[in-house]
Amino acid sequence: MVPFEYYVALSGLLMVLGFIGVIIRKNIIAMLLSTELMLNAVNIAFVAFDMKLHDVVGQVFVFFILTIAAAEAAIGLGLIIAIYRMKKDVDVEKLTELKG
């Protein structure tokens, strides 16, 4: 069986990679994917601590987070498509105005 610390290290690494992706990327789609990566890192951490503590609460939180992540992805992609139809670009630096 894989040790608990490996799961926590993997979770931390994925969280850092997702955070760097949100900070560095200029494309909204890449930023959305990086956010999803961070949410999955949290899921791995919840399951790892759930294994360590022998409790089911972590798995329940994972189901809630997956539901929220799916809704976030659907709404985010809808907004990105609407922005692309109006501006013909999804680069964050070119999207400076919030009014239509």
UniProtKB/Swiss-Prot annotation:
* Pfam families linked to this entry: Oxidored_q2
This enzyme catalyses: a quinone + NADH + 5 H(+)(in) = a quinol + NAD(+) + 4 H(+)(out)
EC number(s) recorded for this UniProt protein? 7.1.1.-
Transmembrane segments annotated in the record for this chain: 4-24, 28-48, 61-81
InterPro entries found in the cross-reference section:
NADH_UbQ_OxRdtase_chain4L/K, NUOK/Mnh_C1-like
Task: Name its cellular compartments.
Answer: Cell inner membrane
Q: Which domain of life is it from?
A: Bacteria
Oligomeric state and interaction partners are given as: NDH-1 is composed of 14 different subunits. Subunits NuoA, H, J, K, L, M, N constitute the membrane sector of the complex.
Query: This protein is called what?
Result: NADH-quinone oxidoreductase subunit K
What organism, scientifically named, is this protein from? Sulfurihydrogenibium sp. (strain YO3AOP1)
